[in-house]
Curated annotation (Swiss-Prot):
A GO-annotated cellular component: cytoplasm
Encoding gene, per UniProt annotation: dnaE
Gene3D superfamilies: 1.10.150.870, Bacterial DNA polymerase III alpha subunit, thumb domain, Metal-dependent hydrolases, Nucleic acid-binding proteins
EC number: 2.7.7.7
NCBIfam families reported in the protein's UniProt record: polc, PRK05673.1
Protein name listed in UniProt: DNA polymerase III subunit alpha
């Protein structure tokens, strides 16, 4: 093979994030196709792609050169930043490069991102080779300015600290000043004996990618392409040129090419991958292995005492636990993982000791008895047939992986503890990368190309919002996309460009739960990335790469449900303490509680973890779970595979005796499988059952059975043929018929694809059960905790308030004197609305109010509150929201009076604050001489109409709390429905139609599997609710009426709803209140007394009626005197449309009782 003549030493991948288009694998593939022997990827201040690049390079026979580009600051150039490329020549250089990158984030973050100080290179110079940065380097900038003194100073620095390791970089990509710089640099090199090196400053693979790269940079920088202010720093020539192209380009400077090869030869870094490095756990004089055995055996004693309080039963059951524990300990110690278990044990125990709620376990880790004994998990794996080998398989060496759930609000405390224990330099969270996803990339590209918002929005909305959606999938899922793509050239151009950018790395973030603990400093294994303040370090390798690099990952996951349980328990135990009862231990509740399962069977699972979706409620209704094993099955069954395969129907039919239970099939079953499959009525539902079947029928070890399960999941034909043979041989040795064994193997293989990890299902079913139990036994505290968790989502809170009302719980309006930021339960068992759930009121103002209340007692009225609270934190807008929500109802006679007095209260408070500041406020404060004035102010103001009060609640709370808009219509609605309220509805006889009315509280349109549209709305008249279905014909006719907060009158047939257990109506006719009035009302009656009538009133009456003329309803004026009453009928030209607006105007003018509709 001929000697290479050129190697690319400066290349950006998409991990640079500010620029760079290609991913590492395609860059390596292109280099290989060009016959390059080596390649450097030098992303901007990071090594994020190093592990992938290193693997891809070696796989393609290309030597990976490790490097990075930097922005550099030095005192010589003031605030001006220059460029520098740093390559690692050896492993010491790699370590120094890692430290340099980490330091840039930790100490050098500026407006332009991470920066290094040039002086840092002095300490970290060993093993590094520098490329000068071309015209953008410090030498380059100085040359272009003709500042020879500055050039000399810069060169002297590099000659002193990087002899033979500093190269003047030459670039020819057609950008301004490149040639001027190049000639000056070559002259300098000759004069000072400095080596030169050629690069192409690569940003993309092919020159045709230039436009896509320009858009990528414009997206990052926030410009449109045609913006004259947009920086134009790149050229179409910055692609991966071939060796021939580079040789032709630098034919006049051959040494610049030769030096690329020499540098490549000098760069020899070995990155240790595929090993594991655990931190040392303190065990005193004992070995880690012995200490684990000691702690596990002590823990098992405690667990057995809890599980089997009866000593005789404990002695009887003990052998199987001891045997299982010994087996697991042997495997853990042989595989070298005792330290891992001890580390997890310690931070979980610390959490429990310090009031941080911890989940019962999740994932396959719940299958370990050692984990249960160490209190890492809280489910007895023997009771639920959970297998250790599903977690840690001695026949397939891989790191154990405990996913641990913590309370969301306290999770960071645990991470802080771990950092304190092992050293902050040894603990870090893990990076995660945001990429340009299908929907967002359409919007971003459209914006940069300058398309109108509506045009881009139309295309973007055609892309389904499903997780993992791609443009390719969207084209298959949405027929309109390919249609507009072919029909519209602008759409085609936008989508084609979006396809080039889809999946490109856009930004970096923090992994939801991953934490790594190193035996030494994190930077011995990976560089760090930090936020702009140099805090919250994360490894620059993502979760898979960081493990491959040797660091052990621990998942500290935040589970909101644990926070809810914790809040509920705090309220419950506060009440129990007042009653002299011991605190409730949620881990000790019985798993067979009848009240909980009765609630579950009624599908009353709103707010219950994992069980609250409509589909899950439907499954619960059909399954009627009556034991904890059924709850474990619920979690496993409610997935697309089981639901679509018919497995769920079989499971339900077998449970309820509609289908014969067989193990696993009527034709092909074996009695030995009964203990394995009995909990699931003979259905192969769990991965553990697949493993147990292989063990029972064919003598597999559980480790070998886990390998079989994995093989079945991957569906590799050659591996399956091998496993089929092993299964057949084992079955034959056990004396099982060969045909039967193979038929069962086929069934197992079929269901293995749907099988779920029972350990995970059981652990999460336990959390589900705990929330179900709390809802059944402590409904107010539980629902208050759930609403607190959802305070930022008004729509969710509204739904949860509805559920509270359905449960018969009383909810009090927010109250500035008794309320808290969050929802809580008072001594009477009523839920007090959380002040923090009021829209438009932040945490700061509420804290200021509660602080003033704690300091000076309850507020007497509005002036008192304003005087005692810091009005800098509590502005007028916030106070208005609090008044409208009802939070100030105790501070005045009514909300209108409070709103009317607000200006005076704020003014008085301001005067009080000023007087206090100069020491002249009297001890009685602002109120000393004002009570009478306040009373007068209140008395002069009329209360708001009920609808205004309710509208204020709706605006600030998202719902009506103290009343209901339907109240003003009830008398009228009785006329339309014959006096029947929704709570009194009954199923209609066949062919009979009944009428119902109510406020629409929910409305949606769904599409069935057959493509038919169905409208569903829920009516509420405060007595009850009714779900109304509108099938195709009715929906086409009335869909425009299906809006929330509209009063509807609906006629149709009423029947039982098998899903909800309530009633539903199939609609035939739908009217809103205006149409009903036009249809049923016979007149609009206005009653006036002789004392009311004058020219002014009649004139205003005329003005109110005028806009509503041309309707069909006649107006009748009733004139009342002490001795007589007369009816005057207005002429036909004064017939009106009796809208809400007209009725409200007239009632406001004359009086609520003097305006009403007349019916036959």
């Amino acid at each position: 093979m001929s000697e290479p003549r050129f190697v690319h030493l400066r290349v950006h991948s998409d991990y640079s994030m500010i620029d760079g288009l290609a991913k590492t694998a395609p860059l390596v593939k292109k280099a290989a196709a060009l016959g390059m022997p080596a390649l450097a990827i030098t992303d901007f201040t990071n090594l994020c792609g190093l592990v992938k690049f290193y693997g891809a390079g070696h796989g393609a026979g290309i030597k990976p050169i490790v490097g990075a580009d930097f922005n550099v600051q030095c005192d010589l150039l003031g605030d001006e930043l220059t460029h520098l490329t740093v390559l690692a020549a050896n492993n010491i250089g790699y370590q120094n490069l890692t430290l340099l990158i980490s330091k840039a984030y930790q100490r050098g973050y500026g407006a332009a991102g991470p920066i290094i100080d040039r002086d840092w290179l002095i300490e970290l110079n060993e093993g590094l080779i520098l490329l000068s940065g071309g015209r953008m380097g410090d030498v380059g900038r100085s040359l272009l300015r003709g500042n020879s003194a500055l050039v000399d100073e810069c060169v002297a620095f590099y000659e002193e600290h990087f002899p033979d390791r500093y190269f003047l970089e030459l670039i020819r990509t057609g950008r301004p000043d490149e040639e001027s710089y190049l000639h000056a640099a070559v002259e300098l090199a000759e004069a000072r004996g400095l080596p030169v090196v050629a690069t192409n400053d690569v940003r993309f693979i092919d020159s045709s990618d230039f436009d896509a790269h320009e858009i990528r940079v414009a997206i990052h920088d926030g410009f449109t392409l045609d913006d004259p202010k947009r920086p134009r720093n790149y050229s179409p020539q910055q692609y991966m040129r071939s060796e021939e192209e580079m040789c032709e380009l630098f034919a006049d400077i051959p040494e610049a090419l030769a030096n690329t090869v020499e540098i490549a030869k000098r760069c020899n870094v070995t990155v240790r991958l595929g090993e594991y490095f655990l931190p040392q756990f303190p065990t005193g004089d004992m070995s880690t292995e012995d200490y684990l055995v000691k702690r596990a055996k002590e823990g098992l004693e405690e667990r057995l005492a809890f599980l089997f309080p009866d000593e005789e039963e404990r002695l009887k059951r003990r052998p199987e636990y001891d045997e299982r524990l010994d087996t697991e300990l042997q495997v853990i110690n042989q595989m070298g993982f005792p330290g891992y278990f001890l580390i997890v044990m310690e931070f979980i125990q610390w959490s429990k000791d310090n009031g941080v709620p911890v989940g019962p376990g999740r994932g396959s880790g719940a299958g370990s008895l050692v984990a249960y004994a160490l209190k890492i998990t809280d489910l007895d794996p023997l009771e639920f047939d959970l297998l250790f080998e599903r977690f840690l398989n001695p026949e397939r060496v891989s790191m154990p992986d405990f996913d641990v759930d913590f309370c969301m609000e306290k999770r960071d405390q645990v991470i802080e503890h771990v950092a304190d224990m092992y050293g902050r330099d040894a603990v870090s969270q893990i990076i995660t990368f945001g990429t340009m996803a299908a929907k967002a990339v359409i919007r971003d590209v459209g914006r940069v190309l300058g398309h109108p918002y509506g045009f881009v929005d139309r295309i973007s909305k055609l892309i389904p919002p499903d997780p993992g959606m791609t443009l390719a999938k969207a084209f298959e899922a949405e027929p309109q996309l390919p249609e507009i793509y072919e029909a519209d050239e602008e759409v085609k151009a936008l989508i084609d460009m979006a396809r080039k950018l889809e999946g490109v790395t856009r930004n970096a973030g923090k992994h939801a739960g991953g934490v790594v603990i190193a035996p030494t400093k994190i930077t011995d294994f990976a560089p760090l990335y930090c936020d702009e303040e140099g805090k919250h370090p994360v490894t620059q390798f993502d979760k898979s790469d960081v493990e491959y690099a040797g660091l052990v990952k621990f998942d500290f996951l935040g589970l909101r449900t644990l926070t809810i349980i914790n809040w509920a328990l705090e309220m419950i135990n506060k009440r129990r303490a007042k009653n002299g009862e011991p605190p409730l231990d949620i881990a000790a509740i019985p798993l067979d509680d009848k009240k909980s399962f009765d609630m579950l069977q009624r599908s009353e699972t709103t707010a219950v973890f994992q069980l609250e979706s409509r589909g899950m409620k439907d499954l619960i209704k059909r399954l009627q779970p009556d034991c904890f094993e059924d709850m474990i099955a619920l979690v496993a069954l409610f997935r697309p595979g089981p639901l679509q395969s018919g497995m769920v129907d079989n499971f339900i039919d077998r449970k309820h005796g509609r289908e014969e239970i067989s193990y696993p099939d009527v034709q092909w079953q074996h009695e030995s499988l009964k203990p394995v499959l009995e909990p699931t009525y003979g259905i192969i539902l769990y991965q553990e059952q697949v493993m147990q079947i292989a063990q029972v029928l064919s003598g597999y070890t559980l480790g070998g059975a886990d390998m079989l399960r994995r093989a079945m999941g991957k569906k590799k034909p050659e591996e399956m043929a091998k496993q089929r043979s092993v299964f057949a041989e084992g079955a034959e040795k056990n004396g099982i018929n060969a045909e039967l064994a193979m038929k069962i193997f086929d069934l197992v293989e079929k269901f293995a694809g749907y099988g779920f990890n029972k350990s995970h299902s059981a652990a999460y079913a336990l959390v589900s059960y705990q929330t179900l139990w709390l809802k059944a036994h402590y409904p107010a505290e539980f629902m208050a905790a759930v609403m607190t968790a959802d305070m930022d989502n008004t729509e969710k809170v509204v739904g949860l308030v509805d559920e509270c009302w359905r449960m018969g719980l009383k909810i009090l309006p927010p109250d500035i004197n008794s309320g808290l930021y969050h929802f809580h339960v008072n001594d009477d068992g009523e839920i007090v609305y959380g002040i923090g759930a009021i829209k438009g009121v932040g945490e700061g103002p509420i804290e200021a109010i509660i602080e003033a209340r704690n300091k000076g007692g309850y507020f007497r009225e509005l002036f008192d509150l304003c005087a005692r609270t810091d009005t800098k934190k509590l502005n007028r807008r916030v106070l208005e929201k609090l008044i409208m929500s009802g939070a100030f109802d105790r501070l005045g006679p009514h909300r209108a009076a409070l709103m009317n007095s607000l200006g005076d209260a704020l003014k008085a408070a301001d005067q009080h604050a000023k007087a206090e500041a100069i020491g002249q406020a009297d001890m009685f404060g602002v109120l000393a001489e004002e009570p009478e004035q306040i009373e007068q102010s209140y008395a002069s103001c009329q209360p708001w109409p009920e609808q205004v009060v309710l509208d204020g609640e709706r605006e600030t709370l998202g719902l009506y709390l103290t009343g209901h808009p339907i109240n003003q219509y009830l008398k009228e609605i009785e006329r339309y429905v014959g006096g029947v309220r929704l709570k009194d509805m009954h199923p209609t006889e066949r062919g009979k139609v009944t009428t119902a009315a109510g406020l629409v509280v929910a409305a949606r349109v769904m599409v069935t599997k057959r493509g038919n549209r169905i409208g569903i709305c829920t009516l509420d008249d405060r007595s009850g609710r009714l779900e109304v279905m509108l099938f195709t014909d009715a929906l086409d006719k009335y869909q425009q009426l299906l809006e929330k907060d509209r009063i509807l009158i609906v006629s149709g047939q009423v029947s039982f709803d098998d899903f909800s257990g309530g009633l539903k109506m199939t609609a035939r006719e739908v009217m809103d209140i205006d149409e009903a009035r036009e249809k049923y009302a016979r007149g609009l009656a206005i009653s006036l007394t002789d004392r009311q009538i004058d020219d002014q009133l009649l004139n205003r009456l005329r003005q109110s009626l005028e806009p509503h003329r041309s309707g069909t309803i006649p107006v009748h004026l009733y004139y009342q005197r002490a001795d007589a009453r007369a009816r005057l009928r207005f002429g036909a030209t004064w017939r009106v449309s009796p809208s809400d607006r007209l009725l409200n105007d007239l009632r406001g003018l004359i009086g609520s009782e003097q305006v009403e509709l007349e019916f036959d």
